[in-house]
């Protein structure tokens, strides 16, 4: 009986030692139970060996699936037992009608961003065009002002020249001019000789009376001579000439 009791005691001791799976928290060498991997899910060990205390696991679900539960698990002490922070997550399939709204929202956001970008570009383009038009207007205004100044200066110059010419051509009242037309004077002997030759030709012409011939003018070499060219459109003054006689230049000698 004593032997049987000792045998039972020896068998009971190893059983009790083998039954202790988790050591005391002071050892910090416990392990967490293995997790069951959910269907269509993957996990990644971020820290630890996958079961020891301090291990961190991250779960992921494929596309068109939604994770139910926490995707980040940590092996920690809870009293004297090492356990995971939460249960393993589950990947749930998302129906198509639920993803349709998400897709529509994404497309709408993209379209709105494109519209905003286009409007901003159009605004910038309009601003640039306005700046270019303003610069062109300024240049045209400057050129117009310059041309107007040049025209005013030219007009003043022309008016001054016209007024000076008009004053120069204005007839002077006096006994030396008989008609309002162009005349020239000279006091050289050469002009006197030319006038004498003209007088001889006039004297030789039988159709011209002697009253028009020059007398004594060729003898003075310093005599001032003025020749008047009568206007052919105006009739000559009646000084002894017949109406049927041809009009010829009249020569006068001023002593």
From Swiss-Prot:
Membrane-crossing segments per the record: 104-124
Annotated glycan sites: 27
Disulfide links within the chain: 32-75, 61-91
Domain Sushi per the UniProt entry, residue ranges: 30-93
Extracellular-facing ranges: 1-103
Gene Ontology CC: plasma membrane
Span list, region Disordered: 1-25, 173-255
Superkingdom, natural source: Eukaryota
Keyword NAD: no
Cytoplasmic side: 125-255
Subcellular location: Cell membrane
Inducing or repressing factors: Up-regulated upon treatment with estradiol in MCF-7 cells.
Expressed in which tissues: Highly expressed in estrogen receptor-positive breast tumors.
Record's bilayer topology term: Single-pass membrane protein
Its biological purpose: May play a role in breast tumorigenesis by promoting estrogen-dependent cell proliferation, cell-cell interactions and migration.
Protein name: Sushi domain-containing protein 3
